[in-house]
Amino acid sequence: MLAFHFTTLQKAESEYNYFIVNNLKNLRKVFNIENLKWELLEDESENQSGNIYWFNLSYDHSSGEGSYLYRMEPNTKSKAHHHTGPEEFFILEGDLTDSDGYLYKKGDFVQLSSGSSHYSTTKNGCTSVVTHRGKYIYSEE
């Protein structure tokens, strides 16, 4: 009886794996940074010389969770904001200076804990991948 049950489980697992592999194309999204239609992030771009753009990968405004691409033009400053959950970002190109003066550069992966507050500036422009696990709230600097 145990051998029959084990064989049945193996068969079910095999069928599941076959389904996943053969349906992977229906479960996959691919974005190439060279071919994106960036959107102006108006809340961040108002009242400053440089603009900030984003491309939503999976960010959900209602939960504050997910990922997006974030691009700042040279000599731009983001608005100050507070994080209700952790934020992580990976610098793909350019430079980014946090409000405490810490300079991030291409290749840096940054983790900010829940409860952090900051704004960022860039001298040469910056493109990053950002992931939030909680909402961010604009604040006074």
Model regions and ranges:
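A short, N-terminal "cap"/entry segment at the start of jelly-roll beta-barrel domains
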Residues: 2-63
